[in-house]
Amino acid sequence: MGQPAPYAEGPIQGGDAGELCKCDFLVSISIPQTRSDIPAGARRSSMGPRSLDTCWGRGPERHVHRLECNGVIFTHRNLCLPGGKTKTENEEKTAQLNISKESESHRLIVEGLLMDVPQHPDFKDRLEKSQLHDTGNKTKIGDCTDLTVQDHESSTTEREEIARKLEESSVSTHLITKQGFAKEQVFYKCGECGSYYNPHSDFHLHQRVHTNEKPYTCKECGKTFRYNSKLSRHQKIHTGEKPYSCEECGQAFSQNSHLLQHQKLHGGQRPYECTDCGKTFSYNSKLIRHQRIHTGEKPFKCKECGKAFSCSYDCIIHERIHNGEKPYECKECGKSLSSNSVLIQHQRIHTGEKPYECKECGKAFHRSSVFLQHQRFHTGEQLYKCNECWKTFSCSSRFIVHQRIHNGEKPYECQECGKTFSQKITLVQHQRVHTGEKPYECKECGKAFRWNASFIQHQKWHTRKKLINGTGLSAVKPYCPCAILSPLPPQHTCSALAPPGPPLSSSHAVVLPPSVPFFLLLPSSEKANPSPVQIAHFFQDLAFPGKSSLQSPNPLSHSL
């Protein structure tokens, strides 16, 4: 910073003749808006911006020295003596001190003896250490908000009163004498969030949070980071380096902080408790995330669609849906995934690992979320309730999909034809119409299908065919569906199913055993339908009575 030219002002106290005096002033200035803005326990710092000013003049005379630092204008008036000396407190009892600040223009004017104005937090202790420049004598100063001190007496009462007024002041100014560079606290306030940082390098790094600047890039996966230290920690994921090992269980970690958190699990320490529900946590970060459930706070928003999240990691993973980023690749099948946790779950498909087992029925699961949903079937717990129809759900994803029935939301759009869908799986199935993909192939005949439901129905056809061609056909009486499994008498007409035409006799009905679907084949009227046979109804999973003789002389007269 340049050194602004000093200037002299006011009457000459001892005439215009005399020796040339020289006074040096080193100034460091920082002005936060209010004293309460400075956080307690803030870190100490070396000196912030400084300005050195030199007074040249013939003394003794009263000089007004003008300095400027970071847009703050500082004027100091002192009685200068020949040889660069100043009058002390005892020699100049009538010296006046007047400090004022205009908050809008950040203009600070100090008039009086050069002094230290301590910033934070121990004003009383720091006030007693204030020094006159170029002397060893201490002086006490007044309030920094338009206060005039007529006499600087060293009484205890005055010192306490001055310290109290300083605490109420909103001025944060540092003046350092040429006798030494005392360590002062200089805080830099963020204009975006209002938080203070010290030193200036921390303030500069903090600004990347608001600008979203991430200058450090991982060469392996392309992930970017704000800080070089976080990049170094991230690279250990790719190298597999885990230098920190737990002495209890031998589990290794890439970061020492993760090891310390893990060790709390062995000790059973859960020092962080939720004041709303009483739930305890091993880590403060988990408590903070948990409390957002009660407050409903979702501070992290997707820049593409505006969707809000309570956890920053969930927001990052969600944004990869828009940009298509999938940095994690499965070494078994080459599939790319959006997060490391999803990759771990996917790998269990290849390994067959199912670490989550239900104690009620013994069923095991790959993923914890599916396991928790399954447990709700046993407990009957329904966490999610629709306000429109009062239907309840045990799974949040099903609840969200259900709500789209009422609001008509269809967020998934086909890029080929523009058709929209309420569920992503429906969109995936629809896209197979355009791509021609048929992922479900029958091992019996090689026929392929676009949809899983059609594939399952096709497989049942092979099962029925095997039963008919083999010995699996049970000799049971035909039954009428409208009579609720009552025996079908000769010449019985089914009013519910039979179309207009000839009455249905038992010789036209075929009933398969309980292990396969049940269906009736009815002769159709030539006027109603030119087809020789009409499928009237289709039943699945019906229970049938015991074996009896088949009424039809030729049960397979209608070919399947």
UniProtKB/Swiss-Prot annotation:
Keyword tags: DNA-binding, Metal-binding, Nucleus, Repeat, Transcription, Transcription regulation, Zinc, Zinc-finger
InterPro entries: Znf_C2H2_sf, Znf_C2H2_type
One GO biological process term: regulation of transcription by RNA polymerase II
Record's subcellular location: Nucleus
MF terms in GO: DNA-binding transcription factor activity, RNA polymerase II-specific; RNA polymerase II transcription regulatory region sequence-specific DNA binding; zinc ion binding
Annotated Pfam families: zf-C2H2
Any one cellular-component term (Gene Ontology): nucleus
Residue intervals of every C2H2-type zinc finger in the record: 188-210, 216-238, 244-266, 272-294, 300-322, 328-350, 356-378, 384-406, 412-434, 440-462
Coiled-coil stretches noted in the UniProt entry, renumbered to this chain: none
UniProt keyword annotation of Metal-binding present: yes
Protein name: Zinc finger protein 619
Recorded name of the encoding gene: ZNF619
